[in-house]
Amino acid sequence: MTISDHPETEPKWWKEATIYQIYPASFKDSNNDGWGDLKGITSKLQYIKDLGVDAIWVCPFYDSPQQDMGYDISNYEKVWPTYGTNEDCFELIDKTHKLGMKFITDLVINHCSTEHEWFKESRSSKTNPKRDWFFWRPPKGYDAEGKPIPPNNWKSFFGGSAWTFDETTNEFYLRLFASRQVDLNWENEDCRRAIFESAVGFWLDHGVDGFRIDTAGLYSKRPGLPDSPIFDKTSKLQHPNWGSHNGPRIHEYHQELHRFMKNRVKDGREIMRVGEVAHGSDNALYTSAARYEVSEVFSFTHVEVGTSPFFRYNIVPFTLKQWKEAIASNFLFINGTDSWATTYIENHDQARSITRFADDSPKYRKISGKLLTLLECSLTGTLYVYQGQEIGQINFKEWPIEKYEDVDVKNNYEIIKKSFGKNSKEMKDFFKGIALLSRDHSRTPMPWTKDKPNAGFTGPDVKPWFFLNESFEQGINVEQESRDDDSVLNFWKRALQARKKYKELMIYGYDFQFIDLDSDQIFSFTKEYEDKTLFAALNFSGEEIEFSLPREGASLSFILGNYDDTDVSSRVLKPWEGRIYLVK
């Protein structure tokens, strides 16, 4: 039912779905080569279904040289052989559907690999028909040593210049990410058509139900690619967002992409589109149903709290109030509109949420993991769960730089070493930053059992592609948690059941109001749906604390909490305790 004053409550499958994100390299290895693969995912579909989720989102499985773990695609229509075959993928889609779940794939179309045939043609000569499918520019000049100077001062998201010099034609190509991850030029209509046909149409024809659209705000660059104003006075290179994010034609491009999808699908299924927009104030424009762009967006505000806007590994202090406001910004904009929101706190680009936002000590890891589950399940929007989050995975501890795999970490390590030295203060700060914030924390292989050395991810005599987080030896694994009724895993199952039972309030709830916003310990709020009110009281501290009622004399009916032995009529919360109530 749609509430007339709240068009956002119009029911849709993709609004009510809980979506489980899979990082294929690290999920499950079926053939003992050390890499996760598509057959491995297929073998665990029942586990995912039993968790209580409704759809899976699989990160890139396409052919790729793997400079950035598959986000550098060399062929959109072929599975990377290490992950399997196209037939393996078609089987995975089919079996996902047979279990009553939807299949969502990653759509990486801001850039492709330099190994893609399109780029090979483009780089071959300045007169090639595909030359304008990418951003080619001559050097701005040459330095005293005769080295070419990049066309502008944009910094790569992964550090260093956003330009790479190519000696084939003595020009630079733009690549906002890794050196061989070259940006596609959406201004070129032939390029757009080819992207739509190869990356989108091919997979729609094979039954996918939706796309997670990678870097969805970057397709329209600032005309002329001018130098960025100086925002970071400590650096000659400037963050590329000013010149590349939410550009003048971005909404036009998403409307065109949506039209292509709608026209391609002939069986009536509704394709969901979640755009990774990251920053900016355009979320309501992107997601308005009347504008036909994307279904919902991922914003980064709440997961970037506590990090520097200039360098993601610089840790800065933050308050609970700041985090609360950042989380709420993900969904407040949809209130009373035809837009929609997402709720997530983990993905393949973020460290583990218990370490980041709760307490990963042995004493409180489990209870604070359940607290984050309560928070996420009580927020309005489409819910996303990232592999390992459901078992309360935490960051790995005290790994040397040699154990890290992420190209972003490796690039910045080399830049800092060259600029400041191996034993500098800057390097020590960098090590603190990656210990808390590195993407690698989310990319360690999934621990299925307690068995050494590989926790059931791959065979015992196989060297996995990436080191396992040693936490599987302390009980953070699927096997042990499945048998433990008090585990984070089984709490997730109960929480997802509650979210479905109370979906009007938990999924579609509107008129969100903070209670005790200024508190640095309590995260509490109310939401409405018709004449019903949900109240959440969550203690984000290691101390007992009393919470305020949503209104004087309110009568509370308990729904769910993360402590079994608690007096739900008491207004005192134990350390890291959370409760969800109906207000009578």
From Swiss-Prot:
Key word Hydrolase present: yes
Pfam families recorded: Alpha-amylase
Acetylation found in the keyword field: no
Keywords of the record: Glycosidase, Hydrolase, Maltose metabolism
Reactions that this protein is recorded to catalyse: Hydrolysis of terminal, non-reducing (1->4)-linked alpha-D-glucose residues with release of alpha-D-glucose
Domain of life: Eukaryota
A Gene Ontology molecular function term of the record: alpha-amylase activity
Annotated Gene3D superfamilies: Glycosidases (3.20.20.80), Golgi alpha-mannosidase II (2.60.40.1180), Oligo-1,6-glucosidase, Domain 2 (3.90.400.10)
Annotated positions for site Transition state stabilizer: 349
GO biological process: one example: maltose catabolic process
InterPro entries for the chain: Glyco_hydro_13_cat_dom, Glyco_hydro_b, Glycoside_hydrolase_SF, O16G_dom_2
SMART domains named in the record: Aamy
Catalytic site: 214, 276
EC number: 3.2.1.20
Protein family per UniProt: Belongs to the glycosyl hydrolase 13 family.
Protein name, per record: Alpha-glucosidase MAL62
Gene source species: Saccharomyces cerevisiae (Baker's yeast)
Lineage: Eukaryota, Fungi, Dikarya, Ascomycota, Saccharomycotina
